[in-house]
Amino acid sequence: MRAMILAAGLGTRLRPLTHDRPKALVEINGRTLLEITLTRLRSFGIHDVIVNAHHLAGMLVDYLQQHDFGMRIEVSREDELLDTGGGLKKAAWFFREQGTDEPFLVHNVDVLSAIDLQRLTRQHRESGALATLAVQRRDTSRQLLFDTRLELCGRKTGDNEPELVCPEEAFQPLAFCGIHIISPRIFARMSEEGVFSIITTYLRLAALGEKIAALPVDEYYWRDVGTPEGLAEATNEFTDLSSSA
């Protein structure tokens, strides 16, 4: 399996730490977020990874050249910040070069978790979904809506009102963890261009009948480390990230 680490963001929530470094190089207990994520992916047997970069991209490239993670790591440099969907579409070549239907993992660099990625992958393969999202039942301003079959059917709007793309009477709000398994056939269905969120693509395709599935992972540790508060919490929660994250 191959993977993409989304690391191109400006890291505005982590300022001033990201004034002089990309957020992927922010450290927890002496280890960069990028190292933690790469090590975790490798522990699940992933050895081919592409990382997108924009803010201070040269520093990220230098870092990867100076550290050997025992993996093939490509960098997708974005002159313009493309958001999650645009960034993935730009990196499509990396997944297409396999010439197979092998699904791939997409993982935000600014989340730490103990989510079982093998379980997520297995669920994806068995369900036949176009994408499978790790989700939790927690409060967030950006909840997605899933029907009784745990298939995407909408999202909460800025005023906390449901915005449904499928005619569902029963739905539940769940928080996306920034970790998902995707089938490469999604690239042929990506009509969006330029800067766009992968959630925009998911919602459009769900409205067309594509199966965008959820796997609840409430029993696993998860932490957003894209804020100073989250970073501090993670630092206190872990004494050995190599065994926990």
Task: State the predicted function of each range.
Residues 19-23:
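Short alpha-helical oligomerization interface
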Residues 8, 53-54, 109, 136, ...:
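Cofactor-binding loop segments of dinucleotide-utilizing enzymes, especially the Rossmann-like FAD-
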Residues 2-5, 13, 27, 31-108, ...:
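Conserved N-terminal catalytic core of the sugar/cofactor nucleotidyltransferase
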Residues 127-137:
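A short, conserved acidic/glycine-rich loop-to-beta-strand motif
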Residues 145-147:
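Short beta-strand-to-turn element immediately C-terminal to the catalytic PLP-Schiff-base lysine
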Residues 46, 104-105, 112, 118-125, ...:
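Catalytic-core segments of class I nucleotidyltransferases/pyrophosphorylases
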